[in-house]
Amino acid sequence: MAKCDICGKGVGFGKKYSHSHIRTNRQWKPNIQPVKAIVDGTPKKIYVCTRCLRSGKVERAI
């Protein structure tokens, strides 16, 4: 579920560095929202990141 159905943005991985430079794994999760949108002419529930919502890549169902 943590993937945008429009652009495919998913979880990013990296490291967190403490003040003493101890490295621990961490992840950056995209801001995914459930949205009722028009897909192929019918309303459908999809998961979309907020960047796609703001840029108007999704036609929302009313």
UniProtKB/Swiss-Prot annotation:
Q: Which cysteines bridge via disulfide bonds?
A: none
Question: GO MF annotations for this entry?
Answer: structural constituent of ribosome
Quick one: a GO cellular component term? ribosome
Q: Name one Pfam family in it.
A: Ribosomal_L28
Its BP terms in the Gene Ontology are:
translation
* Highest taxon above the source species: Bacteria
Provide the alphabetized UniProt keywords: Ribonucleoprotein, Ribosomal protein
HAMAP family cross-referenced by the UniProt entry? Ribosomal_bL28
> Member of which family?
Belongs to the bacterial ribosomal protein bL28 family.
Q: What is this protein called?
A: Large ribosomal subunit protein bL28
The scientific name of the source species is: Syntrophomonas wolfei subsp. wolfei (strain DSM 2245B / Goettingen)
Please name the taxonomic classification of the source. Answer: Bacteria, Bacillati, Bacillota, Clostridia, Eubacteriales
